[in-house]
A protein has these predicted regions:
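Binding-site signature for planar aromatic cofactors or substrates
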Residues: 1-164
Length: 164
């Protein structure tokens, strides 16, 4: 999570294949590569005016959560950038975090929510992104079916592509 100079917060999920999300620069510094996503870059804008960040790391199947707090900066080139390449995608930026605090958070919330128990999941309880989009922009020329197809393809394609 980040916050702008007015204290307005933003939290944005990050993800890469197991073992490739975070690069350990040294004992007190980590780097997280920029990856194509929704292209909003809210968190990066926030870091430019307020370097304070809070990170939560969720590992599927584990109840505890690794939490890191620190000061971040954006870098566009560093010796470790080759280590950030995933599936041929060379990041144009990395978020470098100087760690000030690191600790594990207990598993009670995940245990109560049964987050890692697929048999408890109810994906149809919430409307889809396409349904929410159509409901909030009813004059959109796209049908719900077109939006469902678009979002399905958008999530699957271009995750690591070089095009933006």
């Amino acid at each position: 999570a980040t916050a702008d100079d007015q204290g307005r917060c933003d939290a944005s999920p990050k993800g890469d294949p197991p073992g490739q999300l975070v690069h350990i620069v040294d004992d007190t510094t980590i780097a997280i590569a920029e990856r194509p996503g929704n292209r909003r870059v809210d968190g990066y804008h926030n870091v430019l005016v307020n370097p304070r960040v809070g990170l939560n790391f969720f590992v599927p199947g584990r109840g505890d959560t690794l939490r890191i707090n620190g000061r971040a900066r954006l870098v566009s080139d560093a010796d470790f950038f080759e280590a950030l390449v995933v599936k041929g995608h060379h990041p144009i930026l990395a978020l470098v975090v100087e760690i000030e605090e690191v600790f594990y958070h207990c598993a009670k919330a995940f245990m109560r929510s049964q987050l890692w128990q697929p048999e408890t999941w109810q994906p149809d309880v919430l409307p889809s992104v396409a349904a929410i989009s159509k409901a909030t922009i009813p004059d959109s020329p796209e049908t719900l079916e077109q939006l469902e197809a678009y979002y399905g393809q958008a999530y699957e394609q271009g995750i690591y592509s070089e095009t933006r």
